[in-house]
From Swiss-Prot:
Its main location: cytoplasm. GO terms for molecular function: ATP binding; phosphoribosyl-ATP diphosphatase activity. Belongs to the PRA-PH family. The gene is hisE. This is Phosphoribosyl-ATP pyrophosphatase. Keywords: Amino-acid biosynthesis, ATP-binding, Cytoplasm, Histidine biosynthesis, Hydrolase, Nucleotide-binding. The keyword Nucleotide-binding applies. Its EC number is 3.6.1.31.
Length: 108
């Protein structure tokens, strides 16, 4: 099973939970609470990932990275996006200098 396969399946599962019972699904609970709740969880999980990385504990880094990725996928699903949208953008950027790619977006 490829990394893309598991992320694609998870992305589909998350999208299917959008209207599930928040009492029975953590993902549905996040959806029902809205983007602020999802963003808060992403922030918390990123902080935990940073701490795991600072401690140099490889297994904890994997666990916390998994939590960050999960919550980012929830955010994408909340906005009707999926890992495929991110994959397409990564393919577009492949082989382009990060400096050049960022400059091509112009100012915000």
């Amino acid at each position: 099973m490829s990394t893309h396969d598991i992320l694609h399946r998870l992305s589909e599962t998350l999208a299917s939970r959008r209207h599930a019972d928040p009492e029975k699904s953590y993902t549905a609970k996040l959806f029902s609470e809205g983007p602020d709740s999802i963003l808060k969880k992403i922030g918390e999980e990123c902080a935990e990932l940073i701490m795991a990385a600072k401690d140099g504990k490889r297994l904890n880094i994997v666990w916390e990275s998994t939590d960050v990725i999960y919550h980012v996928l929830v955010l994408l699903a909340f906005y009707g996006l999926s890992i495929e949208d991110v994959s397409q953008e990564m393919r577009r950027r492949e082989g382009i200098s990060g400096i050049d790619e960022k400059a091509s977006r112009g100012t915000k």
